């Protein structure tokens, strides 16, 4: 067991990590141009945060959280999702007292005890954005635009944006009554989870993936028919913003998301080429969450995107992440004096920004050059006693085999100019 990672976790090796670095770099670029600032929250929180924030009727709270009692007797839970910790930090550090809105993003590991499957692990990584303090539907459209921009820049074009409004506490109260009346005659046929949802948050029965529950709910009354004037106006406004950006979308009354805190907007982005595993992003508005977690009454909207699922989607669509270029220079050496000299030279060139490698295995010159090829070096030099004495080396272009004699002092500038 010491040499095997726990079930539901995965090592990201150098052969894969470049893909993560590429996506994370693109995320940071996009968030920067949209004005989002990075936030980093702890890997664990007080359990109450998720109970109040995520909702006690959710699968996350009821089945999936990693919760333990620490040595101080406190109930602690590993980060199960990114929004609630961001809200907690927003409140704790009085960010609500600053000029609003507050626009945050994060890339973070999250932990859920669920059955490991393709694109879904017990430790996975989530990219999310949050806008706190903006009630206008333009904020909803903006977070959707961030997600769509990322996916399109990665080459995913066959996307389907599905939107819904789940209302507010006022209109949802009326709808919940209508929905419960509709469901009560078939209550015995609902799955065990939905029987619990029926009592606590009946709206979430619509989110169930169990076939028997879907058959029952396919003719359920639509929440969009029960929206109050404010929620209806907000939903119509969102559609205007999506229209002006040129985004196609489908109004799907079944989109309610798996967390209890959503109000008004709920959305999902689906890669149509994948099918059941095709949801790559989901989010929405949560106007009561900040107050529920102990802060002032302020609105919020955001999304979460699983990076493992995103990478799987790219792979299944045949989209390859660009591999990093090879190193700039490999320095081979012959002799003990050159061994020390090239160590110092490599260190100097690295300090000045060149990607440089040299041999640390005491290989023969032939083996060193073979190693340079394996590292995909752009250039190579060989330094021995004569090169040190003359202060000159032959700079070899490893792509075409051409060589040019230059002074050792010229190496850095010559490579940077090519």
Curated annotation (Swiss-Prot):
The places in or outside the cell where this protein is found are: Cytoplasm
The reactions it catalyses are: tRNA(His) + L-histidine + ATP = L-histidyl-tRNA(His) + AMP + diphosphate + H(+)
* Assembly: Homodimer.
Q: Which family does it belong to?
A: Belongs to the class-II aminoacyl-tRNA synthetase family.
**Annotated NCBIfam families:** hisS (TIGR00442)
Give the matching PROSITE patterns.
AA_TRNA_LIGASE_II
Its name, as the record gives it, is Histidine--tRNA ligase
Origin organism is Thermoanaerobacter sp. (strain X514)
The EC number on file is 6.1.1.21
**Gene that specifies this protein:** hisS
Q: Name one Pfam family in it.
A: HGTP_anticodon
User: Can you supply a Gene Ontology BP term from the record?
Assistant: histidyl-tRNA aminoacylation
Q: Which GO terms describe its molecular function?
A: ATP binding; catalytic activity, acting on a protein; histidine-tRNA ligase activity; transferase activity
Q: Which UniProt keywords apply?
A: Aminoacyl-tRNA synthetase, ATP-binding, Cytoplasm, Ligase, Nucleotide-binding, Protein biosynthesis
List the record's Gene Ontology CC terms alphabetically: cytoplasm
């Amino acid at each position: 067991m010491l040499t095997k990672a726990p079930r539901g976790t995965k090592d990201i090796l150098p052969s894969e990590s470049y893909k993560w670095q590429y996506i994370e770099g693109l995320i940071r670029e996009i968030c920067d141009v949209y004005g989002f600032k990075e936030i980093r929250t702890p890997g664990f929180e007080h359990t109450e945060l998720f109970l109040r924030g995520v909702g006690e009727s959710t699968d996350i709270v009821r089945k999936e959280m990693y919760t333990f009692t620490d040595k101080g007797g406190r109930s602690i839970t590993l980060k199960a999702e990114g929004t609630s910790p961001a809200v907690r930090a927003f409140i704790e550090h009085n960010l609500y007292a600053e000029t609003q809105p507050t626009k945050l993003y994060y890339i973070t590991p999250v932990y859920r005890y669920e059955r490991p499957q393709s694109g879904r692990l017990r430790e996975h990584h989530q990219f999310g954005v949050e806008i706190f303090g903006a009630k206008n539907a333009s904020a909803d459209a903006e977070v959707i635009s961030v997600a769509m921009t990322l996916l399109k820049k990665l080459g995913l074009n066959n996307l389907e944006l599905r939107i819904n409004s789940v209302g507010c506490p006022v209109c949802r109260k009326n709808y919940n009554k209508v929905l419960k009346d509709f469901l009560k005659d078939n209550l015995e046929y609902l799955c065990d989870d939905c029987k619990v949802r029926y009592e606590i948050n009946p709206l979430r029965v619509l989110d169930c993936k169990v076939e028997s529950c879907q058959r029952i709910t396919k003719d359920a009354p639509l929440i969009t028919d029960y929206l109050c004037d404010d929620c209806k106006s907000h939903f119509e406004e969102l559609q205007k913003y999506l229209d002006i950006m040129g985004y196609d979308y489908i109004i799907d009354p079944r989109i309610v998301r798996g967390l209890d805190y959503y109000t008004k907007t709920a959305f999902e982005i689906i890669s149509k080429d994948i099918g059941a595993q095709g949801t790559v992003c989901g989010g929405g508005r949560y106007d009561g969450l900040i107050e529920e977690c102990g802060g002032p009454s302020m609105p919020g909207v955001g999304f979460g995107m699983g990076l493992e699922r995103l990478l799987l989607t790219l792979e299944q669509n045949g989209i390859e992440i660009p591999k990093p270029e090879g190193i700039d220079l490999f320095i081979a050496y012959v002799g003990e004096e050159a061994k020390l000299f090239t160590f110092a030279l490599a260190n100097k060139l690295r300090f000045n920004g060149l990607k440089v490698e040299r041999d640390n295995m005491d290989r023969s010159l032939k083996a060193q050059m073979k190693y340079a090829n394996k590292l995909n070096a752009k250039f190579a030099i060989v330094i021995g006693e004569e090169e040190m004495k003359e202060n000159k080396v032959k700079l070899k272009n490893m792509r075409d085999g051409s060589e040019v004699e230059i002074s050792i002092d010229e190496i850095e500038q010559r490579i940077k100019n090519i």
